[in-house]
From Swiss-Prot:
Binding site for ATP: G16, A17, S18, A19, S20, G21, K22, S23
GO-annotated cellular components: cytoplasm
CDD domains listed in its UniProt record: UMPK
Pathway: Pyrimidine metabolism; CTP biosynthesis via salvage pathway; CTP from cytidine: step 1/3; Pyrimidine metabolism; UMP biosynthesis via salvage pathway; UMP from uridine: step 1/1
NCBIfam families associated with the record: PRK05480.1, udk
Annotated source species: Aliivibrio fischeri (strain ATCC 700601 / ES114)
Principal subcellular localization: cytoplasm
Keyword entries, A-Z: ATP-binding, Cytoplasm, Kinase, Nucleotide-binding, Transferase
Protein name: Uridine kinase
Amino acid sequence: MSENSNHHCIIVGIAGASASGKSLIASTIYNELRAKVGDHQIGVITEDSYYKDQSHLTMEERVKTNYDHPNALDHELLCEHLEQLMRGEAVNIPTYSYTEHTRTSEVDVMTPKKVIILEGILLLTDPRLRNLMHASVFMDTPLDICLLRRARRDVEERGRTMESVFEQYQKTVRPMFMQFIDPSKQHADIIVPRGGKNRIAIDVLKAHISRLLKA
């Protein structure tokens, strides 16, 4: 946990494997804290928005990118945006297309918040991001469960074939999990088993955020 003394906003990072329940627990905390801090005082930022722009590459080249490696992400821009939000400045968050494998021309404007929830697979691998967090979480969901969830999500929501999902899992998802993501849980303040519906973990996180807000 960072000893960050900037009180403009509280940043909570939620990391873990793809389809481990990060988005679910982030959205649950977001929805349940809105009544406490106000609709416009809490926001969620997904690390996926900061995949590097690949518009200069052909589609064939884009699909070969290893999206589970830290080099695929623009963490420098993410850090800059978080620092701007902590200074009370609005930022333009990129939007990423999972079907085009690059950023779109649109941006999402985020105004300063009291609480920002970050979620993404590689957040805890970067010391710059860890230093900006007031609390960090790792979703410790078994990989076989993550794979089943990911396959269903990517086929239903992202236009992928089952064959391409399993091929990507074997070539990059699992190896990168073992090399980068799983070791990063040593940096987490809280390790959450059983996925995003872990009610005790949700309540602990909400209570901790509430304490930080009162500090």
